[in-house]
Amino acid sequence: MKNEVKTFRLFVRPDEKSRQIADKIRALNERTTHPLVESDDADLVIAIGGDGTFIDAVTSTKFSKNIIYTGIHTGTLGFLQDLCENDIFSLIQYINYEQELKTRKVYTSCVKVYLKDGNTYKFFALNEAIIAGDNYSKITFAEYINDELLQNVTGNGIVVATSTGDTAYSSNANGAIDFSNNCQLVCTLLTPIRNAAYERFITNPIICSRINLVLKPCDNISIIIDGKKKNIDSSMIGRVEVSMTNSYYINKLDIMDYSKVSIIRNKILGY
């Protein structure tokens, strides 16, 4: 990762509030020697909008470890967008005059999709991967921990969330919230069926670093990464592996010292 910021780039959500904040940043930055660029080799990326804008910025720059990412929210405090409009001047001062920027690692999951014809797709997820039936129809799949069968499941699918994304779709599906700050995955089944006709599901596991969650579907499935459905022929998917290790991460600017508890209290509970 680059230790010094010489150039930075803006990713702006297409709404009036976000555009106004971007204009303020451009005006303030005219007095500095750090140019704004549009290339993927910028040292710093500033996402302006919501957490979705941050995810789009990281995805567009291919989860680069050579970039420092930060975000300015235009609504409520986010888990990724932890700066607000009032922090703009301090941010410009910080990136222009600090000798060494304080960063922290935000871990991502790695999703590998193995097709029946031998081809493989690889994706990274900041928030979650959802493996579900086409149009969230009922599916049956086998769930493995590494090479060992854990359970056979019939339901609408499974959400595999990072510790960053476990308060998003995963929590809406009654998934656990991980406060450990460890590199691990929170797995939540989507409306699993439990009756005499189907094998009873066992658990929603939390998968630690360097352990693979392996899913082998019996039906056609869809792969949704951070809210975006991947264009893969669902009838060709033979196996999906999701893992998280210390080598999968992005570098995030760490100016504000918000705890996960305080963000949940502010963003989700509203007090």
What is the predicted function of each stretch?
Residues 1-48, 53-65, 84-104, 113-123:
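ATP/NTP phosphate-donor binding region
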Residues 50-53, 75, 164-167:
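Short glycine-rich anion-binding loops that position phosphate/pyrophosphate groups of nucleotides
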Residues 105-109, 125-127, 137-139, 156-158, ...:
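A generic structural signal for short beta-strands and their flanking turns/coil linkers
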Residues 2-3, 37-40, 62-63, 101-105, ...:
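Solvent-exposed alpha-helices and their adjacent loops that cap or buttress functional pockets
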Residues 77-156:
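Catalytic core of DAGKc-family lipid kinases
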Residues 65-81:
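Short, acidic/small-residue loops that bind anionic groups at enzyme active sites
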Residues 155-197:
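Gly/Ser/Thr-rich active-site loops/lids in small-molecule metabolic enzymes
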Residues 123, 131, 145, 149-150, ...:
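ATP/nucleoside-binding phosphotransfer catalytic cores, i.e., glycine-rich phosphate-binding loops
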